[in-house]
Structures are given as C-alpha cells and as structure tokens.
Curated annotation (Swiss-Prot):
It comes from the Bacteria. Keywords: ATP-binding, Cytoplasm, DNA damage, DNA repair, DNA replication, DNA-binding, Nucleotide-binding, SOS response. GO terms for cellular component: cytoplasm. The lineage of its organism: Bacteria, Pseudomonadati, Pseudomonadota, Gammaproteobacteria, Lysobacterales. ATP binds at G30, D31, N32, G33, A34, G35, K36, T37. The keyword Transferase does not apply. HAMAP family: RecF. One of its GO terms (biological process) is DNA synthesis involved in DNA repair. This is DNA replication and repair protein RecF. The keyword Nucleotide-binding applies.
C-alpha cells in the first residue's frame, strides 16, 4: 500500500498543496512550524478520522477557512500479483463532515478509516506506553479492525450494549431491567476479549525480535494482558452480576473489556513505570513496527509508515536501526525532520526529499 497523491486544502498553514511521494523512503524537511508535520497529519486524519494533535475543530482548519479538504490516491494489493488504485476524499468543518471513497459517498468515517491503513509515530506516541489504558485498547482494536473483517461489527455490538447498560445504571433502573443488556454485554465482551488476547499473543511473537533489533538495551521480553475483569476466576456474565449493585450505586459499568489493558515486560526493568521518556518512545515505536509487520503478514502488503520529527525523537543509532528495518521491507515511509537525519545519510537513491516552507511543499535534490 502506498500513496501516489495527497492533496491538502485549508489545513493549518496550507492553503493548497500537492504531495506525490515515492513508494519507498520519503523525507520532508523544513524549519519548526513550517508545516511538514501537517502533511503527515492530513494523512492521519484520513486514516483515523482525527488528528494526532487534537480535534479537527481545535486549530486544524486554516485561519479564515470554513473547512478543510483532503484527497488521497493510493495503490494497494488487489490479488496475488495485481494492484488497484483507490481514491478517498474528506471535507471537515470541525462540526460536520462529508466523505467519498472510490467515487461513492460514505455514511460513516469508519469506511474511510478501514480503506487506508497508516501507522503513525509522533512526539506524543510515548503515551501508548506511559499513558492510560485507552490508547492501548485503541492500539489492539486498530490491529484487529484492519485484519479481521468482522471485528468492527463485534466492537460496535459491545459498545452499544455498554452504552445502553450505562444509561440504565445512571437512571437508577431496577435490576431486572439490566438482564438483557448484561447478556448482550457478556456475550460480545467474551468474544471481543478472546480476539484481543489472540492478537496480543501473535503480536508478542513479532514484537520481541523487533525490539531486540532496534533497541536491544530495553530487554523487552513479553506482553501481559489484563482483560478488564477477573477472567481467570469468573465469566464476564458472573462478573457483571456480582458487580451489579456497586455499578448501580456508581452509575457505570465497572467490569468488562472496556477496562482492559496490556503492558510490556522487560528483563532488566521492573515495569513500564520505570521507563524514561526516551525508553517509552522506543518501546512504543517497537510496538508500532511490530503491528505494521503483523498487518503486512496478514494482508500481504505494508501499511503506510509515517514518522514525525524522527531526528529529535531518536538518537542517530536508534534512527539507523529503525530506518534499516523499514528500508528492508517493501513499505512506503514518510519521515519529517528539520534536516537530514544521520540515519538517512546512506539511503541513496531510495530516498526522495521534499522541503516545506511558506506553505509550499517542493521536491528537492540532495544538494539543495
């Protein structure tokens, strides 16, 4: 999977810009604040329905503009040896949005997100390891969403049951009114948890060698999973029943996969809380690379890899290891930096360079 064309209108500093990246390594340079991150941000919005720097209405739309527009054309695998071209467009005002995919209107942002797969590493990615459980649950669900066609329906089934149960709890509904939603929550939640656990076990097999290759000093050895209730002791149905009175008092559901979490284990460290910010970033990057490799194995093609501000996030040795691993894979990689990162100094003809300045994006040569 690789982007052939990215068109951006009225996004941050850009009034209108066209980007035609190579299918291999791409480097976007520019001063801080020039807008190079916004190129990756536009791609991320199309693939996730949100920016990695906040909501669309919080400064993403260019000052004076009413909305932003993003258009992406990409090539993806269509069979054993064939490719097809796909196109998607999104217009977003911060309050309302319209989207098109392959010439057809889409009713849900999920349709766009399911079509285009982008793995993003950016300065805030360390929260995947050092933050709360929500980004880690999203991480698992993204991987499942893109490799298991029926996962989204399962996730929505659980989310709907959870919303209905919580609404009844807040209303102080009688216990018997919870029975139907408890059954739905337990049935979908058990299946959701099994899928997550299977995915995490598969991911662990890829993560350990990835972490060893790019950051051997971490000693990352395994992943642990907390399903969101005492699954080894009781079923989710029983856990919901046992917690029912407490949930009625508190007004929310305290047991289930919406409270699940996972964590990395390290040979030489007591746990993720002992990690420095730099170590948390490296661990997060290893997890993202492992997820991308799993996607490639399951789908037969790599997702698009977007690495923002790589030079300031990793030292030259870790940069070199990461780039070497990505360059050895048939992945399209988009990297931003203020200048040529040392890890890319030997990339040669596989690297296409661009410069961002004054709201413009132009191809450059190594001598520029």
């Amino acid at each position: 999977m690789h982007v052939a064309r990215l068109s951006i209108h009225r996004l941050r500093r850009f009034e209108a810009v066209e980007f035609h990246p190579a299918s291999t390594l791409n480097l976007l340079t520019g001063d801080n604040g020039a807008g190079k991150t916004s190129v990756l941000e536009a791609l991320h919005v199309m693939a996730y329905g949100r920016s990695f720097r906040g909501r669309v209405r919080d400064g993403l739309i260019r000052q004076g503009g009413q909305d932003l527009e993003i258009f992406v054309e990409w090539r993806e695998r269509a069979g054993d040896s064939t490719e097809r071209t796909r196109r998607a467009g999104l217009r977003h005002s911060g309050q309302e949005w319209t989207g098109r995919l392959d010439g057809e209107d889409v009713a849900q942002l999920g349709s766009l997100c399911a079509a285009l797969a982008v793995v993003t590493f950016e300065p805030g990615s360390h929260v995947l390891i050092s933050g709360g459980g929500e980004p880690r649950r999203r991480f698992l669900d993204w991987g499942l969403f893109h490799v298991e066609p029926d996962f989204l329906a399962l996730w929505r089934r659980y989310a709907r049951a959870l919303k209905q149960r919580n609404a009844l709890l807040k209303q102080g509904a009688q216990p018997q009114m919870l029975d139907a939603w408890d059954h739905e929550l337990a049935e979908s939640g058990e299946t959701l948890t099994s899928r997550r656990l299977q995915y995490l076990e598969r991911l662990q097999e890829r993560l350990v060698p990835v972490a060893t290759a790019i950051a051997p000093s971490l000693g990352l050895s395994a992943l642990t999973f907390a399903p969101g209730w005492r699954r080894h002791e009781v079923s989710l149905a029983d856990a919901l029943l046992l917690a029912r009175e407490r949930d009625r008092q508190n007004g929310y559901t305290s047991q289930g996969p919406h409270r699940a979490d996972w964590a990395p284990l390290f040979d030489a460290l007591p746990g993720k809380d002992a990690l420095s910010r730099g170590q948390a970033k490296l661990t997060a990057l290893a997890c993202l690379l492992a997820q991308a490799e799993d996607f490639a194995h399951e789908r037969g093609e790599w997702p698009i890899m977007a690495l923002d501000d790589l030079g300031s996030e990793l030292d030259r040795h870790h940069q070199a290891r990461v780039i070497q691993r990505l360059a050895s894979a048939p992945a399209q990689v988009l990297i931003t930096a203020t200048e040529l990162p040392p890890g890319l100094a030997d990339a040669g003809k596989t690297l296409r360079r661009f410069h961002v300045e004054h709201g413009q994006l132009v191809p450059t040569t190594a001598a520029d």
